[in-house]
């Protein structure tokens, strides 16, 4: 009762052949087995929030495993292998009834998929999705702000938006800028293919501008500005952080302190940069 445990059930993906022996369809049987496995590994009786990691059906965002596809492949529009949303919801209802999960949510969903799940749950008398976890940070704002903010307002669905990658996989710490310490460690150096959406795009150039803003407003570092900005969005209920050590964890927690404010002037400058770099991770250099 002292912590909230959240985990996910992954869906089909060509680059996750090792997961559940390659059978990652979000069928009822697979979802139930995945939750039992999570309960065993977590050594707990229940999960507070179970999330469906990404859609089982075809959507452009996850077709190639890197969440940055921008073209809609019409040949994949009819996906005969996708599990109906009704079947996925049936599995979630079973888990709720069994007491193995307290709430359920979505992740990397589309506005249509989120609303469809919400309506199906209402029709079936099942608890509606509590949350939808989405990619959101200074470099990636458009899909959330244009497609989900209105959908998730309290008077509409009331689904909580959880932001993941608030530091853009570490890019928004500033440690990968060329004038920073070249010996710095990080996943993007140790695993060059990790989060390739931030490599080979205009993201690095945008980061330089955000770094300069952070310094001009006397922020301790770019990380503090990036995290604090996400946390102060009125439509973001919480954010998912990641830390490799206690120093990074302390830095992340410190950013939740209200002493690191976002003034109206700073907000305007950030929005001006967003106008300049509206979707940098989708534009190749």
Swiss-Prot record:
Annotated membrane-spanning segments are none
Domain of life, per lineage:
Eukaryota
Extract one GO molecular function annotation from the record.
oxidoreductase activity
Q: Does the keyword NADP apply?
A: yes
Annotated NADP(+) binding sites:
165-175
Q: Which Pfam families match?
A: Aldo_ket_red
Alphabetically list the UniProt keywords. NADP, Oxidoreductase
Family from the record: Belongs to the aldo/keto reductase family. Aldo/keto reductase 2 subfamily.
Q: Which PANTHER family match?
A: NAD(P)-LINKED OXIDOREDUCTASE SUPERFAMILY PROTEIN, NADH-SPECIFIC METHYLGLYOXAL REDUCTASE-RELATED
What name does UniProt use for this protein? Answer: Aldo-keto reductase
Record the organism.
Babesia bovis
């Amino acid at each position: 009762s002292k912590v909230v445990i959240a985990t996910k059930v992954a869906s089909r993906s060509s680059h996750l052949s090792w997961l559940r022996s390659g059978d990652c369809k979000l069928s009822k049987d697979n979802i139930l087995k995945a939750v039992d496995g999570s309960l065993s590994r977590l050594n707990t009786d229940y999960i507070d929030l179970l999330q469906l990691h990404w859609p089982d059906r075809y959507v452009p965002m996850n077709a190639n495993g890197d969440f940055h596809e921008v073209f809609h492949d019409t040949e994949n529009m009819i996906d005969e292998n996708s599990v109906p949303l009704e079947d996925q919801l049936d599995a979630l209802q079973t888990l709720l009834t069994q007491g193995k999960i307290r709430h359920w949510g979505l992740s990397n969903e589309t506005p249509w998929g989120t609303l469809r799940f919400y309506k199906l749950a209402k029709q079936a008398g099942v608890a509606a999705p509590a949350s939808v976890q989405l990619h959101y940070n200074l470099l990636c704002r458009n899909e959330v702000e244009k497609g989900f903010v209105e959908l998730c307002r309290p008077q509409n669905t009331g689904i909580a938006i959880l932001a993941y990658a608030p530091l853009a996989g570490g890019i928004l710490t500033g440690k990968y800028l060329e004038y920073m310490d070249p010996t710095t460690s990080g996943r993007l150096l140790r695993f060059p293919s990790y989060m390739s959406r931030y490599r080979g795009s205009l993201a690095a150039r945008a980061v330089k501008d955000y770094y300069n803003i952070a310094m001009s407003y006397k922020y301790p570092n770019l990380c503090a500005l990036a995290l604090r900005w996400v946390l102060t969005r009125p439509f973001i209920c919480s954010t998912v952080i990641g830390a490799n050590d206690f120093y990074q964890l302390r830095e992340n927690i410190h950013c939740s302190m209200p002493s690191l404010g976002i003034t109206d002037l700073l907000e305007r400058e950030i929005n001006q940069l967003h106008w300049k770099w509206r979707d940098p991770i989708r534009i190749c250099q």
